[in-house]
Amino acid sequence: MIPIMRIPFLNKLNKRKIVSVVRLNGLIASGARGGISDSALAPIFEKAFRKGNPSAVAFIINSPGGSPVQSSLVGDRIKRLSEETEVPTIAFVEDVAASGGYWIASAANEIYADHASIIGSIGVISSGFGLQELLARYGVERRVYTAGKSKSMLDPFKKEKAEDVKRLKGILSQLHEVFINHVNGARAGKLSTEHDLFTGEIWLAAQAKELGLIDGIGHFVPVLKERFGEKTRFKEYSQKKSLSQRFGVSIAKDAISLVEEK
């Protein structure tokens, strides 16, 4: 039997660095199959960090945000697994990492983006409609019965109350403070102190870099090959799509192709 270490091909293979790649696309929401949620991503993250002895885990992010809770859970999982496995993490922003998308990106050790990437929106929003006049116009009476004076707070079919709005703004302020504390902790020593970064404003990559919100401008393959070598292997881990999802994507692609041909 030939000892494994004496086989030239295997020796070369063993020297090649492996980088795990996880794509995070879409809205951040609980149970979002194919989107971004902690429960859906947990097994994928486990494989990305623990299989194949990776030199790093790269997260390719394209998200406008979503649930603050899911953003926090996903971000904390990234940091926790990185600490447990001692595997560094690098986020690469494609079109956008805004709001919850940036929350997750900032959980990585480093953040890179394209020149045209949109970064930031570090804020919290709640929106809705007031439809009480529409009901009155059509002579519709809505009947609601509750136990607990705040149970129907901000009902869109009732005129809003000042105390309800005050309560909601207080909740939003608390969530905003949690977001701010996360970013300050994750980007400690990197953030600009000359600009208010937490107004919900967005920036392109060049200014985001000046403000310390990202570490550099670059794409994931060139950046990682420069760091780990030209022979670096990329192993992508992704969610398995259901048959209906794959079928739906196929139909959409065929429809687009048909329109383009016409």
Predicted segments with their positions:
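N-terminal organellar transit peptides
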Residues: 1-114, 125-262
